[in-house]
């Protein structure tokens, strides 16, 4: 059973339905053989029904494209959730991925632009196609773009990350963590791109945040500079000292020795 819940009866289950007195329980019937029925099912609140709709759409292939495009356009203002579902289903069809991504990225709705980023990641498209979003006005879109850079092999990834990093305001902890996740296992290239972009002028509230979260070979020396700086208060020093615990290698040892001098 589930630990702590005292679940002992594993042979039976109970489903409770709360409804007004006299209401009738009706299960909608969908026709998954044609675009109209598929889209009606795609709009269902039931995950199982939406799954069947998605599978039917994929089976229909190119025949489903016109209806999906129309459905997405009709729901752009009326119901963005349905627009997102349609764009995702469209993007998973053969030869439709890149165009579906671009349609999503051009939306005025930041949530739909996020869908575009996630679809691009799902389709393993080059992040270079998302570069324009590095200056997006919505921080949630930029956070999603940062996440999409995680383990990216694109030659454009470090520059995109650096652009995103320069827009950290030193207040958005979630933005900072998105940068950290996005730079995983590629900190050396990403941090170097950031330092070059700011021309070495990294010692700001936001810049210190980025150094604190980073795991590059340069990080220990930068942390040592922060810790020993006259502008760093005694109350702030422990934070940067603890950050060194997450690092390893000879650079870490050299930084500790520099701090103790």
Q: Residue ranges of each PLM-predicted region?
A:
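Long, ordered, helix-rich scaffold segments
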Residues: 6-14, 18-261
């Amino acid at each position: 059973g589930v630990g702590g819940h005292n679940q002992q009866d594993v042979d039976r289950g109970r489903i409770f339905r709360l409804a007004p007195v006299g209401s009738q329980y009706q299960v909608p019937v969908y026709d998954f053989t044609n675009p109209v029925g598929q889209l009606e099912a795609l709009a269902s609140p039931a995950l199982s029904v939406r799954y069947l709709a998605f599978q039917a759409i994929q089976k229909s292939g190119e025949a489903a494209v016109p209806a999906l495009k129309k459905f997405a356009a009709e729901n752009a203002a009326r119901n963005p959730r349905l627009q997102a579902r349609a764009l995702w289903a469209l993007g998973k069809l053969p030869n439709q991925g890149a165009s579906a991504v671009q349609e999503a990225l051009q939306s005025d709705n930041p949530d739909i632009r996020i869908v575009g980023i996630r679809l691009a990641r799902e389709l393993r498209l080059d992040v270079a196609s998302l570069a324009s979003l590095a200056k997006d006005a919505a921080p949630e879109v930029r956070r999603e773009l940062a996440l999409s850079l995680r383990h990216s092999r694109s030659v454009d990834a470090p520059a995109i990350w650096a652009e995103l990093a320069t827009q950290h305001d030193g207040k958005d902890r979630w933005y900072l963590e998105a940068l950290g996740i996005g730079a995983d296992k590629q900190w050396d290239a990403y941090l170097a791109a950031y330092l070059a972009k700011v021309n070495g002028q990294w010692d700001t509230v936001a810049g210190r945040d980025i150094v604190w979260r980073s795991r590059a070979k340069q990080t220990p020396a930068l942390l040592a500079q922060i810790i020993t700086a006259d502008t760093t208060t005694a109350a702030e020093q422990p934070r940067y000292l603890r950050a060194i615990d997450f690092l390893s290698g000879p650079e870490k040892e050299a930084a500790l020795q520099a701090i103790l001098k």
